[in-house]
Structures are given as C-alpha cells and as structure tokens.
Amino acid sequence: MNDVQKDPVCGMTVLPGRGLTASYGDQTIYFCSEYCRNKFLEKPALYLAALTTRSFAETKEHRRVAYFSVEVGVGASMPTYSGGLGVLAGDTLKSCADLRVPVVGVTLLYRKGYFDQKFDEWGGQQEGPVEWNPAHFLQLLPELAQVEIEQRTVQVRAWQYNVVGLSGYVVPLILLDTNVEGNADDDRALTDYLYGGDQKYRLAQEIVLGIGGVRMLRALGYSGVEKFHMNEGHASLLVLELLNRQKEEQPAEWDFEKVRNRCVFTTHTPVPAGHDKFEYDLVKRAMGQVVPFEIIQMLGGQERLNVTLLALNLSRYVNGVAKRHEEVSREMFPGYPINHITNGVHSWTWTCDSFKALYDRYIPGWDNDPAMLRKALSLPKDDVWAAHVEAKARLLALVKEQTGVSLSADALTIGFARRATQYKRADLVFSDMQRLLDMVRRGYPLQFVFAGKAHPRDGEGKELIRRIVAVARQTGDQIPIVYLENYDMGLARLIISGSDLWLNTPQRPLEASGTSGMKAAHNGVPSFSTLDGWWIEGCLEGQTGWAIGGQEEGAADADSVNRRDAEDLYQKLENVIAPLFYQQRQRWLDVMRQAIALNASYFNTHRMVQQYVTNAYLP
C-alpha cells in the first residue's frame, strides 16, 4: 500500500504514474484529475489539513447496512466491474460516503477482471485477462472465513478499499478472494473472472459472495449490521446463511420473519431469462447443508433454484430500478410487493472537469447536494458552451490518439457507449444510411463515437460490433464513425461528456433503468432515446432531450418495431435535432441547461440513497 496515494481534494485513490502531481513544500501530491489539482493549488493548506483529519476510524460496530453486489466499480483502474450494475454499486457507495450513511460494501475480488478488449481490423473482438495488482489499491486483511463447496473447505480472505466521501467519511468495501494458499488450484481461481466460467463456476462464486460474505463480516467484527441489501440476485444465498445463524441462536425453529425483516432486495432484470437459475443436482453437490434442502426448494422454486425468487421470499423491501421496471417486475412475479427507486449516478464522479468548474463558480455546494443543479437554468449560456467545447476537445483528442481519425470540432457528435448486446440495438441508427448521407449533403454533418464490450460468449453482441465497424469502413469520411476499444469508466466519462447528443435505442421494455443518459445530463448533453427505463420519467420532449417512438411495447415482430423506431429516429434527427444544433444554438443551449436542471438534479445517487435510507433501511 506504500505506493498508493489519496487525492486531497476528492479522496480518490491515485496510483503513481497514472495521475497528475504537484509539489508543495517537500511533498509530491497526487491527483486524479486536472480539476482537483487546480482546486488544490488554490488552497493547498486547507486540502492537506482535510486529508490528514479525515474520519477513517469509525468503529465497525456502527455499520448498520451491508451492501452486497457481485460487481462494484469504484474507479477505472480497478477492474472489479463490467458495466452498469457495478458502476451503480460504486456510485451508491460513494454517495453513502458523502452522506455519511453507515454502510459496508461486500463484493468479489476479480484478479483477472472482466476482460481486456482489442479489435482486429474487421471489428472482431479479442479478449484477454486484465493485468492489475490488488496490493496497489487495497489493504489485505488478516481474517479468514470458510465456505463449503462440493464437500471441500474453501478458505476466503478479504481485501479492503476505502471509499472516501467528500466530507472525509469512509465506507469500507470488502473484496473477497479465494486465492489463498492451501486451497485447491480450481478453488483459488474462483474469484479470477467476473461473469466467467460455466454454471458450476457461477454458483461457486455466489456461494463465496453470499455465504462467505456474511461469514467474513462476522469474522471482521461487523456485529452491528441490521440490514443486508442484495444488489441483484447474485448475493441472495446470504439469506440462507442468515437463516442458519438464526437457527443456531434459536434452535427451536426457522425464523423466516426475522431474517426477512433484515433483508432488502433490488432487482435489475426486466426479463425472466435474465434471472440466474441453477439445477438442484448442482446445488446439492456444491452447497452442502447450509440449511435443509427442502427449505431451499420452498424458498427458491420447486424445479430449479431461482436466486431472484429466493431473495424475493426473504426480503422485507423489494424494489425495481425505475417506475416502469416496477410494473414489469410485478408482472413477472405476481403477488410480491415490488416497489421502485429509480437509479441515479454519482454527480461528482460523472461530471467532467470543465462542468465541475462551471458549477463551482455559479452553484457552490452542488457536489454534496446535487439537487442544487436545478439552478442550472440561470447558467450563462456562453459559459455552458465553453465548458462543453472543452469536454468535446478532450474526446476528439482521445479519438485521434486511439484511432488516428480526426473528428471535426464543429460536427454534431453522437455518442453511444454501453454493453454490446442485441437488445441495445446499437446499429439501429444505421438502418437506412442513405437518410444519414442525405442529411450530410443538406449541410448537417454527422459523426459517431461508439464503445462497449460484448460478453465473451455473446456471439450476437460480437456480430453487432462487427456490423458497426463495417459501416464505418463503408462510409469513410462522409460520416466518420469510430468504435473505441476497451470501454471502462474512464473512457465512458470522456465519451459521455464530449458528445453533443447521447443516443440510446434499447428494445422496450428490456431496459430496467439505464444510467448513461443521467451521466450525460450532468454534462449538459441531451438524450435521444427510446422511451424505456429512466427516460420515461426524465424525458420532457424538446426540453431535456427527445424520445424515439412511444411507450407502446410489443408488435407483430421485432422487424416492424425496428422499422417504426428507425423512422421516428430519422424524422427527429433530420427535422428537429440537427436544425436546432446547427441553426438555433441559443435554443440548443436552453436544452443543455434544462437537461442539467431537470435531469441531473434528480437522477443522482444522493437522491437515490436518501430514498433507500427512508424506504428500505430505516423501517
């Protein structure tokens, strides 16, 4: 840990050689961004004093909530996340730290990450392990826990990462690791890959996370935990360990109600096929006797273990992640009292440096109270545009560096960066290339920046990337299209803040929430999206952005839905959005300010965490 430094302005971990530095006296100070370095240089003594007095020492007994997630993204340099679920978990813990919510996070340590992504010349995705050293970021803890997997005792150790809030309050994140001397080779590899391996591998990981996580918290001394929050069903086996512990304390009965009162469950999946299910033959072999099999079958389903059903049956508070997602989830699981708390993003993390400086100047205090961003309606338009031009220049410089393609600073730049999977319909905008070429000939230049990984076993997702790369080769300079490699949080920040328009085209109702448009709004970038997930709540047509199609779902076939949505996309792009961007800049700036004031001020994790505290943690 000697090589790890803390940014004195925001508290983020900085690895020497990757961040920025400044000299102060005889010290070298490290920063995660140019913005933080500039803020430090304004008042160096103040920030150094804050760094040395931060409250790292709150006792473990005071932690009241344990937040479990199979992936957590706290920074681009730690590959313990793959996409939206993990980034949301990281943003949640950051807001908990800012708001001083007594939470401890639990996840797995992925020594080889999700995967490192490269493309061949045709857009074929090639995967490799991510090389990183946990000791550069984390503190290894001495305690061990044990789980039984296929009648073997597997030792689990823990690493700790401190998520430091803007006030200095610390939320510890515990990362579980089976790479322990004495474990069998296969067991040591259980925490190597995120979403890797087969069903057997995935179930073993969920045993380590859910059962091992509860046991590790106990070993570490987190004795005051009152609520266990499962962020998606991967952690649901923790309810079995809670039942087991409850039975040890009260041998006369299985107290389902007492366990239920301690559990909170957030579901993120809008389709039945997305919920993990395991054959009971595998469950019996892998899990052993945490609780009697008939109890698992009673709570998790008769034919197979459905981890979502297990969590639903033993959680007092259950929620989807958007209003529409609540409705979809109630249809999937009738009879369960499913609520909704719409997702958000961590405002400080996802606001680029130029907009941070803008908000600091005109809306001081916004960082720890993002609701204040509603005041953005009065931001000077010239300053908003200058901040955007700076963000766009950073994106274009990155594109040039990575691809050699020189994009225009003046052309309408459309961004699309998210997981490459079929339902996201990343190539919908290219359904009729002639329409786009006609726009360019009419004086509306367009350029596109794409990024996103396809799961290694998702052949359709990989083919989607190849199709976009093929379109890029065909259009050449007429409509520049780039697909950037190795999408992560750092790349996401640059693409989201540097685009002029944020495109999102998921097939309805398959987007549970989505958060990239919320991040765009924090940087004054309006969304252009199908009405699904959070955008049903966030879209004010022509004010915060634009909708593609209506809210109707289902059709005779997917092709007719695609044709209808593509037609609406082209109609609005060529008749409303492009003319507004090129011919009515002042009106475009109104939309930018409204996206900040109406979307960023609400769709943030500070508001979201406050709702979890009120609705889920306190009752």
For every predicted segment, state its role:
Residues 17-20, 44:
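Short Cys/His-rich "knuckle" micro-motifs
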Residues 1-4:
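Short, flexible, mixed-charge glycine/proline-rich loop motifs
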Residues 13-17, 34-35, 39:
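Cys/His-rich metal-chelating microdomains
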Residues 14, 29, 154-156:
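Short, isolated positions in well-ordered beta-strands
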Residues 7:
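Short cysteine-rich clusters marking metal-coordination/redox-active sites
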Residues 21-28:
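Short linker/helix segments within small regulatory modules
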Residues 53-619:
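Catalytic cores of carbohydrate-active enzymes across secretory and cytosolic contexts
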Residues 30-31, 40, 47:
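Conserved hydrophobic/aromatic "anchor" residues
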